[in-house]
Amino acid sequence: MSYIRSSIFVLIGASCMILSQSCSTCSRQQTLENIVVDLDLADLAADSVYVNMGREVLYALPNPIKVSMLIKKWGVGFQSALLHDPAKASGYLTKKNMAVNFGIYITDLTTAGLYEQTQTVLRYKQALQQLVEGLGLQAAVDQKMMKQLEDNINNRNEMLRIISETYSSCTAFLQAEDRHLYALAMLSGGWIEGMYIAASTIDQKSENLLKQLIADNKPTFDLLWQALSDLDNVPEDAVILLSQMSDLATLMNVATDNATPEMTAKVKNQILLLRSNFIKE
């Protein structure tokens, strides 16, 4: 990949608009929570026209807050069993696995924070600190930021803002260091974990929600997959990741054009498979 615009790991405008529309019936407070990342939706929508996977790239940041807010809107209570065990953070030894699970853990941290599960938040904060050190991200996430997270543990909106800032700081830092694979692995882990939690939750709701979930999140996935496809000199330990993401891309395309229960079930199963493989030590 010859060039990537610096510091542009941001939400794609289209997904922001989907989020905004999905919460049109929410209370004013919920709407404020949806934009807690403090980004201007109009500016993001304008920036999205610059997407180009050749010489200049605008990455979509699959924001953990988006899917977590959606799940909470469905009226589903906190389900800790769906989250990845933070105690396993020390078991990831390769940079690729650390990056993928950083994305997974920060999504779980977001979910716990949204449901105001303070002790769970602290456990995921500790897991992230281990991965920050393993990935050499101390310059992107300093102790001050981690302390701010802990100090604001009872201030949900501020805590979610700090989490979002941490996520974007880490991916931008990796991008600036020309560690594109790890930045994309982090984004992939976050996207898959959010979809995994949402898809698993849908078992308790309506099959139509699964179709809508896939359709609403396809724009960000398409950009993520295109960026992954554009990687040069992919190391051996990432080949399987790309292959499985390729399978998901194929299924997502078919499910969008032919949203039968069978096809949406295949997409869900591929997401579950990817998540299972991602968390293996």
Segments (PLM) and residue ranges:
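Generic structural concept
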Residues: 103, 125, 129, 164-167, ...
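Extended amphipathic alpha-helical interaction segments
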Residues: 150-231
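Secondary-structure edge/capping motif, primarily at the C-terminal ends of alpha-helices
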Residues: 109-116, 135, 139, 174-177, ...
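Non-transmembrane, amphipathic alpha-helical segments
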Residues: 90-97, 109-116, 120, 148-151, ...
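C-terminal motif of bacterial Sec signal peptides marking the signal peptidase cleavage site
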Residues: 18-25
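Bacterial N-terminal signal peptides that target proteins for export
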Residues: 1-10
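A cross-kingdom marker for long, charged
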Residues: 226-281
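N-terminal Sec/ER secretory leader and immediately downstream segment
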Residues: 30-145
